[in-house]
Amino acid sequence: MTEQQPVAVLGGGSFGTAVANLLAENGHPVRQWMRDPAQAESMRVNRENPRYLKGIRLHDGVQPVNDLLATLQGSELIFVALPSSALRSVLAPHAELLRGKGLVSLTKGIEAHTFKLMSQILEEIAPEARIGVLSGPNLAREIAEHALTATVVASEDEALCRQVQEVLHGRTFRVYASTDRFGVELGGALKNVYAIIAGMAVALGMGENTKSMLITRALAEMTRFAVSQGANPMTFLGLAGVGDLIVTCSSPKSRNYQVGHALGQGLTLEEAVSRLGEVAEGVNTLKVLKAKAQEVQVYMPLVAGLHAILFEGRTLNQVIEHLMRAEPKTDVDFISTSGFN
């Protein structure tokens, strides 16, 4: 890739726009593709993404476009920020154009009917592409406002990791590398569920002890499940694990937190999602994660509890009673209990 060749960003949402701006600020021409031609035209003319990043100026180096074919043909490095429900249908018809290209997923979600992560779908669509993921405690608006931020690029392709670091690393954005693509990506997808729980807890006025307990036990659940699927537990002590979990469960800027907060205020799930106005991946992830945890017999009481509230007609008080009266457990799964007398 030369400096003159555009980097592609697929998706017109908040995170795709924030990454497009970062790339342009670092001197790289960017083509940001979006499905809606009216949105692309509006962003071209007004230099702003008012629906998803209102008040943030779109860098002059970002070219909003609606021609997917030309975008894919003209770029060797492509950042994919499409909703999990749309990624396969958008890219599968153009699989031949992706051969040998660098594809970096920015989407923190799981495909409902396959339980595949986004990078696994990319690998299936384009087996000869170079695949990576970018994940971490990365609120789009804060990135766009140049708050000091760090993230993780994960791939077994060291050259791809270096390439992503080179194009994104800057004065306010630091990029670390990892070889645990599966763990990094799974952490980003799973934490969305717990952000919904955290938002509910805040809306209901629960104390600091409760919020701390929720985040810590969420990390335990995430790690337990991820290790059962082959991830490295140490990944969850890094930016893509506990780092992402903390920011998503603590910030009103988090989309999934906002959904949970609305639920805690008494809105229905449909009303909460409608108020948000964009995709909250945690709602979709919850359904497939609950089923998968049952299938592989991994203990995930917070996931089961939230699912019971949203989809099984259980009340919050019933779920809290069940969780607090459950059989006592050891704190950390990876510490041996053989030392007990």
UniProtKB/Swiss-Prot annotation:
Chief localisation class: cytoplasm
Residues annotated as binding sn-glycerol 3-phosphate: K108, G136, K191, D244, S254, R255, N256
Location within or outside the cell: Cytoplasm
Organism: Pseudomonas entomophila (strain L48)
Binding site for NADPH: S14, F15, R35, K108, A140, R255, V279, E281
Residues at the active site: K191 (proton acceptor)
Biological pathway: Membrane lipid metabolism; glycerophospholipid metabolism
Catalytic function, reaction form: sn-glycerol 3-phosphate + NAD(+) = dihydroxyacetone phosphate + NADH + H(+); sn-glycerol 3-phosphate + NADP(+) = dihydroxyacetone phosphate + NADPH + H(+)
Keywords, ordered alphabetically: Cytoplasm, Lipid biosynthesis, Lipid metabolism, NAD, NADP, Nucleotide-binding, Oxidoreductase, Phospholipid biosynthesis, Phospholipid metabolism
One GO CC term, this protein: cytosol
Protein name: Glycerol-3-phosphate dehydrogenase [NAD(P)+]
